[in-house]
């Protein structure tokens, strides 16, 4: 790990804020803003710097001591260390703070841990003192730019934002923190939502109920420190003295939470700017700031100004030792809270990612003014960028068409604040279906019955929305899926995708299928190959989307990490062994063997025999003793039964006569939606398979046989080698060529892929493999 990044982690994350104390008589235990405790540093160093020896850790400590000094005055502090690190990464051009382009990746890694404002405000305060200046503008963009003008010129040609989650594409931590710091009373229920600690060095502190209470008390202390330091900056002696008394008896803070809220209310009424229709959102966003900061980023300006003023007061000697230590505590608590909302841990997989996603609005939920600011900051700030060509925002369909219409109305009302109508038109929406984890076996119900019902309800509300009124129709462009792939496979959404992609939407003056001139169909994106138990499993999921969901030219696969990851590096990362369910491994073996045969890249004889043997052993375990078959089922037969999974499983409960009749005359069904029960992908080939009773029985058992389900859910270890990795590599290349031929795009998301996947560096991202031809040119 980068030495500066590691040192920042130790002094602001690993060493608890409770250890910051000026008055400890024992020098060996003293830890404060100007003296990092050596014993505590060396205790934490092995987990942060495992590549270094004990002696090297000691050298790192003394290097930290040196780097905490101001090069002009020799004053030493953790704040100066932040400024010195920022000085290596940032530059001030006289107008704005920019990231040095040659430090871009370091800036990403370091600022991701603490937030950009943590460094930018410190850097700006130091520069303003040096240039005898005082910044008034704090509503700068959420993400600062680099100093590479050539890159800006390229980006100014136009950019499309094709994957924009409202809750994940904005300053989530800052919004929650500002709301919490202004509304700290009555928050116990919000902290109880945090079931476990997600940061490695804090997880044990949050996993028990009493520790969740401690986390709330910790944030109460931060709120008290913030209002106290704010009063110091503003010269409000009453709040300063009263809050100071409370800070001297920290054990009394939790029982005096209403008093802290009173301090905040006093500061709000005296200093806070009232935002039209929303009231005072942050007392640190002062009345005299609105002339310079009334834009889409205004909600961020108060906290930035507070950080800037505190850093400046420290550098100018206006804060005493106690106030400096309190600000150090505030930064530590702030960083801890941020780490429970922003994915700064290094765990891979979608579940970890999803746990963070669920927390995005815990502390602003129900606070309408802050919820509006979230939408305003997310949408309007992006739409106002001159180079933004289009913005594709993703939301879940409402439970009813009326609920959806109301949500679009609220969004549009906020977007209308962007005065330029052409900019407003850049925004459109994609409705995504959340994947839901399967429940236990229930007699007569297919796999993922709960997800199928929820998705069908969402589909019906979408169709009713389009039929209801064309006012917002032209704002909805497509459909997608979201949440964990491991919870349910593409087969669950197959019929819904085929149906929704075929309906005709009326954009103006009229409803679905009726009247008007502007008609179109919904576009399709499906998130697949992002999270998987094995690379083969991820590739099969991508193939299932193409086969079952009716994707065609112009459609997109979201992420598709499995399609581009280096199989050798992936399996090496997994120690050449993966753990998955027997059912998934059985499916994967049948799929990979048939893929290899189809593209003419059969593995060597030894590997082929090994894979076939594993298939037959698993098949016998799961199916052989639980179904009736007139002959020995081959790998090809099983693969054919897999091809039927795009069909609605309810069809396979019909008698043979009813099934064949329905297959022959699908148009005679009750509703248009039912006409899409059969998958039409390579229909002639699939119809031959459907007429085979033994293959139909396999598909029926897959869904409705309890013993098959139970046996298939057992876990198994699957060992692979370099020969298997080579086979996967060839299958990947063939699938990439197929995507090119069929005109299906891959929607890449480098930042979330880096967090979810096994790639260690951005230059390992599959996008370089997908675009290798043009890069080589």
Where does each model-flagged region fall?
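Metal-cofactor-binding active-site regions of metalloenzymes
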Residues: 1-777
């Amino acid at each position: 790990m980068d030495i500066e990044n590691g040192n920042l982690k130790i002094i602001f994350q690993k060493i608890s804020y409770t250890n910051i104390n000026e008055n400890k008589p024992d020098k060996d235990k003293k830890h404060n803003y100007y003296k990092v405790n050596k014993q505590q540093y060396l205790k934490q160093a092995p987990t942060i710097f495992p590549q270094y020896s004990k002696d090297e850790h000691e050298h790192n400590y003394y290097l930290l001591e040196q780097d905490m000094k101001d090069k002009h005055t020799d004053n030493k502090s953790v704040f100066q260390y932040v400024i010195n690190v920022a000085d290596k990464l940032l530059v001030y051009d006289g107008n704005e703070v920019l990231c040095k382009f040659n430090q871009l990746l370091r800036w990403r890694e370091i600022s991701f841990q603490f937030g950009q404002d943590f460094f930018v405000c410190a850097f700006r305060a130091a520069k303003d003192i040096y240039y005898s200046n005082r910044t008034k503008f704090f509503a700068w963009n959420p993400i600062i730019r680099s100093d590479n003008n050539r890159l800006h010129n390229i980006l100014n040609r136009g950019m499309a934002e094709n994957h924009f989650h409202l809750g994940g594409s904005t300053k989530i931590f800052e919004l929650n923190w500002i709301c919490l710091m202004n509304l700290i009373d009555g928050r116990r229920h919000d902290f109880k939502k945090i079931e476990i600690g997600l940061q490695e060095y804090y997880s044990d502190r949050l996993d028990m109920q009493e520790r969740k209470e401690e986390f709330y008390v910790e944030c109460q202390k931060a709120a008290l420190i913030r209002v106290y330091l704010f009063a110091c900056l503003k010269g409000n002696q009453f709040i300063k003295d009263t809050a100071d008394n409370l800070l001297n008896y920290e054990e009394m803070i939790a029982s005096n939470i209403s008093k802290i809220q009173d301090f905040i209310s006093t500061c709000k009424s005296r200093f806070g700017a009232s935002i039209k229709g929303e009231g005072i959102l942050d007392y640190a966003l002062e009345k005299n700031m609105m002339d310079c900061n009334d834009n889409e980023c205004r909600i961020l300006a108060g906290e930035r100004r507070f950080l800037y003023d505190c850093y400046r007061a420290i550098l100018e000697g206006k804060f005493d030792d106690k106030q400096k230590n309190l600000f150090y505590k505030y930064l530590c608590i702030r960083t801890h809270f941020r780490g429970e909302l922003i994915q700064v841990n290094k765990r891979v997989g979608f579940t970890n990612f999803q746990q963070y996603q669920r927390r995005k609005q815990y502390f602003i939920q129900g606070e309408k003014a802050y919820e509006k600011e979230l939408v305003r900051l997310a949408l309007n700030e992006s739409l106002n960028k001159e180079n933004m060509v289009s913005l594709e925002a993703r939301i879940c369909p409402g439970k009813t068409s009326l609920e959806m219409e109301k949500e679009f109305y609220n969004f549009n009302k906020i977007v209308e604040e962007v005065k330029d109508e052409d900019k407003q038109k850049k925004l459109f929406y994609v409705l995504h279906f959340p994947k839901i984890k399967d429940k236990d076996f229930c007699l007569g119900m297919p796999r993922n019955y709960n997800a199928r019902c929820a998705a069908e309800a969402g589909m019906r509300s979408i169709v009713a929305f389009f039929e209801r009124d064309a006012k917002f129709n032209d704002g909805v462009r497509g459909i997608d899926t979201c949440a964990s792939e491991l919870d349910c496979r593409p087969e669950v959404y197959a019929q819904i995708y085929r149906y929704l992609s075929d309906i005709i939407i009326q954009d103006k003056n009229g409803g679905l299928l009726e009247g008007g001139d502007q008609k179109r169909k919904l576009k399709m994106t499906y998130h697949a190959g992002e999270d998987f138990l094995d690379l083969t499993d991820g590739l099969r999921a991508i193939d299932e989307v193409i086969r079952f969901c009716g994707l065609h030219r112009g459609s997109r696969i979201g992420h598709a990490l499995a399609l581009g990851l280096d199989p050798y590096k992936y399996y090496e990362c997994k120690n050449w062994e993966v753990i998955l369910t027997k059912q998934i491994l059985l499916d994967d073996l049948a799929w990979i063997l048939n893929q290899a045969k189809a593209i003419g890249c059969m593995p060597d004889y030894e590997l082929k025999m090994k894979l076939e043997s594993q298939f037959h052993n698993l098949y016998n375990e799961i199916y052989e003793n639980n179904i009736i078959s007139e002959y020995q089922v081959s790998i090809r037969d099983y693969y054919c039964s897999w091809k039927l999974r795009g069909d609605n499983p309810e069809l396979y409960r019909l008698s043979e006569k009813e099934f064949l009749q329905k297959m022959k005359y699908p148009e005679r069904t009750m509703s248009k939606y039912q006409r899409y029960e059969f998958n039409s992908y390579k229909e002639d080939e699939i119809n031959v398979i459907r007429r085979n009773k033994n293959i139909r029985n396999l598909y029926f058992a897959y869904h409705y046989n309890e013993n098959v389900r139970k046996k298939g859910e057992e876990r198994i270890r699957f060992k692979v080698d370099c020969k298997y990795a080579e086979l996967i590599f060839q299958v990947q290349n063939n699938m990439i060529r197929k995507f090119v031929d069929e005109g299906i795009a891959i929607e890449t998301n480098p930042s979330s892929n880096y967090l979810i996947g096994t790639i260690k560096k951005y230059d390992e991202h599959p996008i370089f493999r997908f675009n290798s031809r043009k890069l080589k040119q």
